[in-house]
A protein has these predicted regions:
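Helix-loop junctions and terminal segments of transmembrane helices
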Residues: 59-77, 139-140, 250, 254-298
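Alpha-helical transmembrane segments of multi-pass membrane proteins
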Residues: 56-57, 96-100, 110-137, 148-156, ...
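Interhelical loop/hinge segments that connect adjacent transmembrane helices in multipass membrane
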Residues: 1-6, 10, 145, 188-233, ...
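Membrane-interface junctions at transmembrane-helix termini in multi-pass inner-membrane proteins
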Residues: 7-8, 68-77, 127-151, 168, ...
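N-terminal membrane topogenesis motif
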Residues: 1-29, 67-70, 74-85, 114, ...
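Hydrophobic alpha-helical transmembrane segments
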Residues: 115-122, 150-195, 212-213, 220, ...
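Alpha-helical transmembrane segments of multi-pass membrane transport and lipid-handling proteins
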Residues: 22, 29, 85-110, 116, ...
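Signature of the first transmembrane helix
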Residues: 6-65, 90-102, 154-163, 178-186, ...
Length: 311
């Protein structure tokens, strides 16, 4: 019974993950095409220059503790409170630091407009830190369908806001507001739908317990974000914002296909593998099945791309 229940949850999670990520990519495609017609490449370039600061700050404030919560067999109110207050405190401190550093960031790129833009954009990760625990709980409980609904609503509403502002000539502020409003809407709905709410109690003991696992995740994610964004920083320093915009947009469209498969699997893999962590052979079997599933989707897609390529 337990085996069939896990299979059903996994299949349901993969199904909704696939449907949700597919719709998400369609929304991104729709809004991306219309925004590209209303905005200049330099607007995207200015947003891209700031991406590394938001991305690394988001990783640091989360500290790998979101993944650590998912990794625990059972989580308590004390665990969730510890991660929530750590994430909120770290996020607030990082925002203050980046707020004060905004003129230096603008000076590094030689674009004064980046100072007020960065201070507004960095609100996104500050808002995001209040939803770290709620998102982890949704993933741990394999509430993929509910999470997808929230994500799609936030994506659609924020996309409409971005389009309206771009139509009114707000340039790069349209993209920045789209990103911040997306985070605000998503976190608000996570709070509304989540069965967990924080309390004022705090203990550092759960953080110490999870630290050996979370620190590895945090460092991995930091290096991953540096690897993904360092070229944009260098281009922003030595090239124009328009050229950076062409690069960031091209890279974004290139990554859409691969992110469709990876996001679908990663949202399900960790919580499922944790449920069978006490049974090594069963865990290996689950991993093999997920690997076959990814191969079943990825290999035909890659062969199709090879067939379409011009010789």
């Amino acid at each position: 019974m337990k085996e069939s229940s896990l299979k059903a949850k996994t299949a349901k999670g993969l199904f909704w993950g696939g449907v949700g990520n597919g719709l998400q990519q369609l929304f991104n495609l729709f809004f991306g095409i219309f925004l590209a017609r209303l905005l200049d490449a330099s607007d995207y370039g200015m947003i891209g220059m700031l991406a590394i600061f938001s991305a690394i700050s988001s990783v640091i404030q989360e500290g790998g503790f979101g993944a650590a919560l998912i990794n625990k067999e059972k989580i308590t109110q004390e665990d969730c409170n510890a991660v929530f207050w750590f994430s909120l405190s770290a996020g607030f401190c990082l925002y203050i630091l980046l707020f004060l550093s905004a003129p230096f960031i603008a000076g590094f790129y030689g674009i004064p407009e980046l100072a007020p833009l960065s201070r507004f954009m960095f609100l996104g990760f500050l808002i995001g830190c209040t939803g770290t625990v709620h998102g982890a709980i949704f993933t741990k409980r394999l509430m993929i369908k509910e999470k997808i609904h929230i994500n799609l609503i936030a994506l659609f509403c924020s996309g409409c806001i971005g389009l309206a502002m771009a139509y009114c000539g707000m340039a790069y502020w349209a993209i920045a507001t789209q990103q911040v409003s997306y985070m605000l809407l998503m976190v608000s709905m996570l709070w509304y739908k989540s069965p967990w709410k924080p309390t004022l109690q705090f203990s550092a003991a759960p953080l110490k317990e999870m630290l050996p696992f979370s620190i590895k995740i945090a460092f991995t994610n930091i290096f991953n974000q540096i690897n993904q964004n360092i070229l944009t920083v260098l281009m922003g320093k030595y090239y124009t914002s328009r050229q950076v915009g062409y690069y960031t947009q091209g890279n974004k469209w290139m990554m859409m296909g691969s992110s469709l498969v990876t996001s679908m699997v990663t949202n399900v893999a960790q919580p499922v593998l944790i449920q069978v962590s006490s049974e090594v052979e069963r865990q290996k079997n689950v991993f093999r099945k997920m690997l076959r599933f990814v191969s079943f989707i990825s290999f035909p897609a890659m062969l199709g791309q090879i067939g379409r390529a011009h010789v």
